[in-house]
Design a protein with these regions (language model features):
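Acidic interaction surfaces
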Residues: 1-196
Length: 196
């Protein structure tokens, strides 16, 4: 399963982004949150998308960040505008204070917003890696070796299929550096060798 602390509410005419399955679902979620923090249905009906976002971001019990996409031969997401031409404001990522403190097992409320902001920025970075295709997997193969022998046991030929049987695999690695990958693969190979 995939667990994030933040909720992403986004609207875009071309892309389905964030935690909602449609722009309409995002609009309903935004209205519900505005209602929770004191806005009437009439006030919500008069608010623009940006005004609803700003209202939520201004709440003391909410830590949130605006979300922007950069759309040029693919898309990426950030909490800051990347470019005046190809960037679009698409929504927000937020977490409410009570939920954050409970999930992080924190009793001390001091600096909760700064800590939550750091967490949310990391979640946006990971989501952007997903949008950009910076997600990796590894597969460990055990080669299959075919040896043909004569009747007296002499080797006649040897055929090695490097991509033989799959021994193990794992996916869901984001923004790996080669050093990260090497360290992880070395650990996994050592574990498998111990089992054998």
């Amino acid at each position: 399963s995939w667990d994030n602390l933040g909720t992403m509410l986004c609207c875009h005419r071309d892309y389905q982004l964030g935690d909602c399955n449609s722009n309409r679902e995002t609009e309903l979620q935004l209205a519900e949150i505005c209602r929770k923090y004191g806005k009437s249905d009439e006030e919500i009906d008069e608010m623009t998308f940006s005004e609803e976002i700003q209202f939520i971001l201004d709440q003391d019990d909410v830590c949130g960040l605006p979300l922007w996409i950069y759309d040029h031969s693919g898309i990426s997401m950030s909490t800051r505008r990347q470019c005046s031409w190809d960037s679009s404001f698409v929504g927000l990522i937020f977490v409410e204070k009570d939920f954050y403190l409970a999930q992080m097992c924190l009793k001390d409320e001091k600096d909760w917003k700064a800590k939550a902001k750091e967490t949310l920025e990391g979640e946006v970075k990971t989501y952007s890696d997903f949008l950009e295709g910076n997600v990796y997997q590894w597969t460990l193969y055990e080669p299959i070796i075919e040896i043909r022998q004569s009747m007296d046991g002499k080797e006649l030929s040897r055929k090695i299929d490097e991509e033989g049987e799959i021994v193990d695999s794992m996916c869901g690695f984001y923004s790996l550096t080669f050093e990260d990958a090497d360290a992880y693969f070395d650990f996994e190979i050592a574990e498998i060798e111990q089992i054998d």
